[in-house]
Amino acid sequence: MKDRTQELRSAKDSDDEEEVVHVDRDHFMDEFFEQVEEIRGCIEKLSEDVEQVKKQHSAILAAPNPDEKTKQELEDLTADIKKTANKVRSKLKAIEQSIEQEEGLNRSSADLRIRKTQHSTLSRKFVEVMTEYNATQSKYRDRCKDRIQRQLEITGRTTTNEELEDMLESGKLAIFTDDIKMDSQMTKQALNEIETRHNEIIKLETSIRELHDMFVDMAMLVESQGEMIDRIEYNVEHSVDYVERAVSDTKKAVKYQSKARRKKIMIIICCVVLGVVLASSIGGTLGL
């Protein structure tokens, strides 16, 4: 009788290896989802901080000379947003590189598709929050600029929008204020506010520059991911046209048929069209 001990031992070793691989993969995905939750939490914090920034902007604009505490709180929020945004960007980049490595090895699995979907979703949410932050900063800059222009008018100095923009870009506030006579308390207050708003704009533009490269990098990533989403949306939009045309053609055809046959034809056509659309959308999503 043939001794199958070695064969059985080899089969057991093979099963053990498969089990180890399976356990390792499960452990890897557990760690991945922990990363996802951490990134999602950071993005939610960013969103909350952006809302706080809006409130601080309103408080600063409401006071001709805002107190130092309010200005410091805004600076702290700005620093926190920068720190959190860089952290999110770094983690998303790490996931992206991991995905690219597996794709380079021509690996395709359900786990990889899940990671790509999660990465795409988180990237989009991140860019949405940072876009809102960028819009908030731009709006604040415009409001500060308007206040400077109004205060210059109080001092008797009229400027065009282009002149004021040139002054802000050069940082040479003295061009407009050196020859203003300090002949009244109102003029002094106006000049103080001009200086305050100008300093706010300088800080703001520094913050915008610091985040610019990161924002462009992530926006380009999301734009490239959007091609797949756009393709799915295109299929869905056109499916509506197909269904509408199918129903219209069916109505014309069944004028000479019984009601029962009319219903049957409409149901068949709609089912076929919807089946094609669903297959197309699912295929596009899974990269088939």
Swiss-Prot record:
PROSITE patterns: SYNTAXIN, T_SNARE. InterPro entries: SNARE, Syntaxin, Syntaxin/epimorphin_CS, Syntaxin_N, T_SNARE_dom. The chain crosses the membrane at residues 265-288. Keywords: Coiled coil, Cytoplasm, Cytoskeleton, Disease variant, Epilepsy, Membrane, Neurotransmitter transport, Nucleus, Phosphoprotein, Transmembrane, Transmembrane helix, Transport. This is Syntaxin-1B. Phosphorylated by CK2. It is linked to Generalized epilepsy with febrile seizures plus 9: An autosomal dominant neurologic disorder characterized by febrile and/or afebrile seizures manifesting in early childhood. Seizure are variable and include generalized tonic-clonic, atonic, myoclonic, complex partial, and absence types. Most patients have remission of seizures later in childhood with no residual neurologic deficits. Rarely, patients may show mild developmental delay or mild intellectual disabilities. Belongs to the syntaxin family. It comes from Homo sapiens. The keyword Kinase does not apply. SMART domains: SynN, t_SNARE. The modification Phosphoserine is found at S10, S14. Residues 1-264 are cytoplasmic. One of its GO terms (cellular component) is axon. Interacts with OTOF. Interacts with SYT6 and SYT8; the interaction is Ca(2+)-dependent. One of its GO terms (biological process) is vesicle docking. Residues 1-20 are annotated as: Disordered. Residues 29-104 form a coiled coil.
